[in-house]
Amino acid sequence: MEIITLQRKRLYAAATVLVQAGLLAACDRTAEIPTPAPTATAGPTVPQVAAPKGPSRLILAFGDSLYAGYGLDRGQSIPDAIQTRLRQAGVNATIVNAGVSGDTSAAGRQRFVFALDNLPRKPDLVLIGLGGNDVLRQIGPAETRANMTAMLDELKTRNIPAMLTGMMAPPNLGADYTRDFNVIWPDLASRYHATLYPFILDGVIGDTRLMQADRVHPNPDGVAKIAERLAPMVKAALPTLAPSS
């Protein structure tokens, strides 16, 4: 019998909250998550920090509504907050936000090459944050794995490093589904030598102080906490630059 660590129990509990909230929000609907209302969640705007001196680092943040900044004002998204923290740490980083609300891994796969080809240059790193809508719609883990694999294969072909911000399915979706889904991200991270943050909403989901009213998306304070955890990992995942001659 597999021994479930306290950390894994905590992540399962958090994932359960996410799915329960998402299913309530999506009850009797099959359409994509709607566009945010004009009045977004109140909260502190991510401060705009000028790019520091040093070599430019281009990062693509490719994901769903958690990257897109659903329900937040412009400049309050997770990629915005990570960019700010990187610049505060002395990294001349620019993050292109390619988050689209409602995207499943299949929808992301369809637009992935287009997103890469329309960047100003080859990115130094690609963050991929998909899977939440796959869980909410209970898409088969094999399909999710195939879509994620295709995107990572594309990055491998282009010699672009990846970082995965993972998603987890809760136990109430069934032991087989949960097992097959939750192993996708660590498996792929190991196979493609990608940096892995196992569950993007860890430490945020379930805390009403950090979540919007829908209980699915973080508010600005939740974004700040996520970025605080992710930014050092993103910095470490950036490839080492060759010394200038």
Which residues does each predicted region cover?
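Alpha-helical cap/lid subdomain in secreted, periplasmic
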Residues: L6, V91, Q110-S245
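Serine-esterase "nucleophile elbow" of acetyl-processing enzymes
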Residues: A37-S101, V113-K122
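Sec-dependent bacterial lipoprotein signal peptides
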Residues: M1-A25
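Bacterial signal peptide processing site
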Residues: C27-A31
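Generic structural signal for helix capping and beta-alpha/helix-loop junctions
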Residues: G69, D103-S105, N172, G206
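Conserved Rossmann-like nucleotide-binding pocket used by diverse enzymes
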Residues: L23, V96, M163
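Cys/His-rich zinc-coordinating "finger/knuckle" motifs
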Residues: P34
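Subtilisin-like peptidase catalytic core
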Residues: G99-G108, G131
